[in-house]
Amino acid sequence: MNGSQDTAPLDPDIFPLLLFHYNNYMPMEESSDVDEPDHDNEQDADDASYKSDGDDEPEEAEKSHRVESAEEANDSLFLYSINTMQEPQCRGLDDLESHFYWVTPQGWLLMRHHDSRETFLGNPSTRERISLPSGQGDFLEENTTRCLLSHAPTDPNCVVLVINCRDTVLWYCSPAAGAQWFEHRYESWRLDESHSVVVGDMRRLTTFGGVFYADLFHTVVKLQFSPHPTFTVTPVGVRSLPLHSCTDFQLLESCGELFRVSFGQQCFVDELLHVGVERLDVAHMAWVKVHTLGDRVFLVNSRYFGASLSAQVAGLKPNCIYFLRRGDKGLYIYNMERGTTTLHNPGRHLQDDVAAEILLIPAA
């Protein structure tokens, strides 16, 4: 988003996108999951059968590296359109090479220039920029953080939140105020008795109605800014789950309700066994199983990201979950009606263990 003439806006019709970037010091790009055990439980979901169009074997990806030359950098950036299932003809986002950046579930990119430290929110579709304070310290130059927005950045109530994915600390600022970043350290024991569970699940925050939510399995944590950060912990009912497998959960908002998607696998075996969806029944504060998404589609990066879109608007298959797995270049599509999962190879030239980011188009 450096405003250069050779970097054109991306065509909205090619979104959503997979963004592969070999040399970028990407936030959370397969940072090790130290102190973050999987939940030793499994959702009661339909078995997923697999059809593969590539010979992709999931592996733990290596941490990506900083770019060493402009020529090498240009070859390291690869876009893949999820709705057309092919590489788009247009070239864009080359200016990512000179920035640290974080992809938000709202489609905006939090960006920070390597040299000038200029910091802003960038719209990859329109090239619009919204300036942010540069901040103190190195928290905007680390790959162990992620970013979310409470509202659209043009909303005066918008809070830009940066979460540390290895410690109980967060940073936040307001684009409207624009004065400075604030640091807040919170005590994990106030949210859960397990420090590692808190750190691991807080990185999977989602936004709903201007409030941030985290799923700690037996509780839902609500984080509000009024104007200072305030946590509220609410117990929720859960079904008893088998103990023979490990499950990752991703929280997301869809049509004004909270959902969580579960990905279950046999412990110590990198083979996906189950995909399930639950909705939070607010009246009874309990998770209930969902059998259909209707005309919606969920996009999930199982490491920390979830979003819901209209299938018709996005040009995707309705009642499906499009998801990425840790350390795996593959794009997986789970069909809720059939209970089957299809694996798509976005590029045979891509290394198998280079995971992508999901890039959405910001709402108008």
Regions found by a protein language model. Name each.
Residues 88-95, 132-134, 183-186, 234-238, ...:
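Short amphipathic beta-strand/extended segments with alternating polar/hydrophobic composition
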Residues 21-22, 81, 113, 262, ...:
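Pocket-edge structural micro-motifs
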Residues 72-84, 169-179, 272-285, 331-340:
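Beta-propeller blade signature
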Residues 86, 128, 257, 286-288, ...:
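Residue-level signal for well-ordered, solvent-exposed loop/turn and beta-edge residues enriched
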